[in-house]
A protein has these predicted regions:
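Glycine-rich anion-binding loops of enzyme active sites
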Residues: 12-106, 238
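Short, compositionally biased
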Residues: 105-116
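Active-site cofactor/substrate anionic-group-binding motifs, chiefly glycine-
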Residues: 1-8
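Short loop/turn motifs at secondary-structure junctions
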Residues: 10-12, 107, 151, 232
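Glycine-/charge-enriched secondary-structure boundary and capping motifs
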Residues: 28-47, 60-65, 122-133, 137-248
Length: 248
C-alpha cells in the first residue's frame, strides 16, 4: 500500500522499514509476518533496510500484534506527475484490485458482527476470512513500465474513501470523471458485503475500491499502448469538464 502511494506520484519506491509490536514473541508468527513484508518488497522492487520488533506484554494480548511501516521513493522533479496535465477527453484506465485491500475494515468488522458471520464460513470456494485478507495488489512493476513509455497525466490509488475521494486526486480543479461501472465485474466479496450490510450501491463506491485498486489517466491516442503494458487493465471511464465523480 505504501509503495502504491509513492507510485501514484510517478515516483519509484526505494526502500521500506517496518515496525512490529507483539504481546509475546512467537518466532513462527514473526517469521510469517516478515516473510509477507519481504514478498511485498519483492513485488514493489524495493529493499527492506531495517525495522524494529517490540515485545509489549500487558499492552497487547497474547497472540495479538500490530504492524506498521513506511516506504521512501524518489524521482526526478520533472518526471513527477502533475494534475495540471489532466484535461477533459482523456481516458481513465482501471487496474483490478485483489479484493478489499487495506481499507474499509471498520465497516467490514461491523457487518460480520451484526450478521454473526465467522471468519471460517465458506465463501466462493474459500473462507470469508481468507477472502477479506487477500494481500493488497502492488502495481509498481507494471505501472512503471507504462510510465517509461506513455505520457501518463495522473494516477489515483483507490484507498479509503473509494472512487469519490480518491479519483479526484489525479485531476486538476474543475475536472471530474464519468465512470462506466459496466466496464468490469465487481468482485463477489463487495456484493456480499453490500447485501449483508444492506448498504446502498452509491455508498459502497464512497467506501471501498469496488474492484479497482488504481487508475491511470492517459490521452486517447495512448490507451492501446498503455493497455498492452498492463496485466489486466481496462478502460474505466473518461475525464470530463464537470467536477465530481459520476458513476453510470
Amino acid at each position: 500500500m505504501c509503495a502504491n502511494d509513492i507510485l501514484a506520484q510517478g515516483a519509484i519506491p526505494l526502500f521500506f522499514l517496518d515496525y512490529l509490536a507483539v504481546g509475546k514473541n512467537y518466532p513462527e508468527q514473526v517469521e510469517a509476518i516478515v516473510e509477507g513484508v519481504a514478498e511485498g518488497c519483492v513485488q514493489a522492487g524495493c529493499a527492506i533496510v531495517g525495522g524494529e520488533t517490540a515485545e509489549m506484554a500487558g499492552f497487547y494480548e497474547d497472540g495479538e500484534y500490530d504492524i506498521a511501516g513506511f516506504c521512501v521513493g524518489a524521482q526526478e522533479k520533472e518526471l513527477l506527475l502533475s494534475t495540471e496535465n489532466t484535461k477533459a477527453g482523456q481516458i481513465v484506465i482501471g487496474l483490478p484490485s485483489s479484493g478489499v485491500h487495506s481499507n474499509g475494515f471498520s465497516l467490514v468488522r461491523k457487518i460480520l458482527k451484526d450478521n454473526n458471520i465467522g471468519l471460517n464460513e465458506e465463501f466462493n470456494g474459500s473462507t470469508v476470512g481468507k477472502t477479506l485478507l487477500t494481500p493488497t495488489k502492488i502495481y509498481v512493476k507494471e505501472v512503471l513500465k507504462v510510465l517509461e513509455e506513455v505520457k501518463v497525466a495522473g494516477i489515483a490509488h483507490i484507498t479509503g474513501g473509494g472512487f469519490h475521494e480518491n479519483l479526484p486526486r489525479a485531476l486538476k480543479n474543475g475536472l471530474g470523471m464519468k465512470i462506466d461501472k459496466s466496464s468490469y465485474e465487481v468482485p463477489e466479496i463487495f456484493k456480499y458485503l453490500q447485501e449483508k450490510g444492506k448498504i446502498d450501491e452509491e455508498e459502497m463506491y464512497h467506501i471501498f475500491n469496488m474492484g479497482v485498486g488504481m487508475s491511470l489517466v492517459v490521452n486517447k491516442e495512448d490507451v492501446d499502448k498503455a493497455l498492452s503494458l498492463l496485466e489486466n487493465g481496462f478502460v474505466l471511464g473518461e475525464v470530463v469538464n464537470e467536477s465530481g465523480i459520476e458513476i453510470i
